[in-house]
A protein has these predicted regions:
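His/acidic/aromatic-lined binding-pocket segments of jelly-roll/cupin-type domains
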Residues: 19-21
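Acidic, Ser/Thr- and proline-rich intrinsically disordered linker/docking segments
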Residues: 2-3, 9-13, 23, 29, ...
Length: 88
């Protein structure tokens, strides 16, 4: 299980929020304490992941069966590696 704190998330609807990510064996849990919000992204719903630079941070773009999610964080490659390890 890998955790990533202070991640800026933008979903397919254009909604942005500050979240914590937790990668488990079957899903990525996305939690925003400030907005009292939690989301679960099943790893089976992931189609592709891509990483690019956004200033001094990494921009991780995830294509899912339900749309696109973008995460901005300092260590994007570690997030992608954790997702790939969990997917097997």
């Amino acid at each position: 299980m890998a955790r990533f704190q202070r991640v800026k998330e933008t979903d397919g609807d254009g909604t942005s929020r500050l979240v914590s990510l937790e990668v488990t064996d079957d899903a990525v849990y996305r939690t925003s304490k400030a907005q009292m919000w939690e989301g679960r992204l099943p790893l089976a719903a992931l189609i592709s992941t891509n990483i690019s630079r956004d200033g001094s941070s990494d921009l991780v773009t995830v294509e899912t069966k339900h749309g696109q999610i973008q995460w901005v964080l300092k260590n994007g490659q570690s997030l992608i590696d954790a997702i790939e390890r969990s997917r097997g």
